[in-house]
Amino acid sequence: MQAERGARGGRGRRGGRERPGGDREPVGAATALARGGCGDGGGRRGRGRGFRRGRGGGGLRGGRWEPGGRGGGASTRVEEDSDSETYGEENDEQGNFSRRKIVSNWDRYQDTEKEVNGESGESQRGTDFSVLLSSAGDSFSQFRFAEEKEWDGETSCPKQNSALYVDSESLVRALEQLPLAVRLNVASELIQTTIPLELPQVKPRRNDDGKELGMHLRGPISELRSAAGACPRSLGRGSLRQSPLEGLQKAPTPTQSVADHLEEELDMLLHLDAPVQEEGNISPDQTSRDQEPEKDGQVAQEETGPEKPSVTREKNVEPEQPSTSKNVTEEELEDWLDSMIS
């Protein structure tokens, strides 16, 4: 009875109590530990060693208190099993993920190449696009509806659709047989069928006026200079402003008069410096002042007629012009030229 009580965790006498100072180990200690209890095998008073937490007191497992007793051991064991399984799964997953590698499947293609080489003796990893298209088949090999098959079955005959059928080759041959005038839709007279043996001669138009001018200018220089010496050197402002073209336009129709006028223009161009120097020395203010007394003298002559003072006055004005023209500086001459140009 006592042995049974000890196995059950009762009050029975324990075998180690008779030894003084010895460790008392209950008979049912192994059974109590197997059940998850601690102390004295899960006794009522909790006399076992360790932490006394009543009947079947729990113990410290993994840094936390686990429930003891009859039902505590089984639940703890299930939790430990589940924790170990999850921890193992995590370790397995981490290990598999870290060790994962890309597996090449090129061996399959190499096997197929070996077979092809054994059959034909040629190694070809890729084929041409045309070969792929030919192997794919045409549109008739694909899926088609029943209506499409019916359309293909109905072969169109040119005799049935004569209104819509046109033979292009025969049309081209018929058009080539037509004459060129009909094809171009122009008059037949405009088209020259034969090639001419001689081309028509085109006579260029000559400028007679330019020829005459060139012949006059080609004359000897001595004659031009002699003719130029005959013309007066004192030219007015109007003659300076006239261009050679204006002089030619105003020239008379006879050739002699044209030649004389050309000589005059040439002499004018050769002696441009002399009249410019003579007239350039006269400022516009002085010319206006000189013109005023001339006008006054003319008016006085018309009014008084035989009065001598007006005549003497005109004579005195004329010699004054060259004396005053010499005193004009170059700056005044440039100013006058600028005023004339503007």
Curated annotation (Swiss-Prot):
Ranges of compositional bias, category Gly residues: 56-74
A single GO cellular-component term on record: membrane
Record's bilayer topology term: Peripheral membrane protein
Main location: membrane
Residue stretches of biased makeup (Basic and acidic residues): 15-26, 108-117, 287-297
Region (Disordered): 1-130, 228-257, 279-342
Subcellular location: Endomembrane system
Record has GTP-binding as a keyword: no
Residue stretches of biased makeup (Basic residues): 44-55
Positions carrying Phosphoserine: 82, 84
Residue ranges with Polar residues bias: 120-130
UniProt keyword terms in alphabetical order: Apoptosis, Membrane, Phosphoprotein
Compositional bias annotation for Acidic residues: 80-93, 330-342
A biological process from GO: negative regulation of apoptotic process
Keyword Zinc-finger: no
Complexes and interactors: Binds Apaf-1, BCL-2 and BAD (Bcl-xl).
Function field: Protects against apoptosis mediated by Apaf-1.
Protein name as it appears in the record: Cell death regulator Aven
The organism of origin for this protein: Mus musculus (Mouse)
Classification of source organism: Eukaryota, Metazoa, Chordata, Craniata, Vertebrata
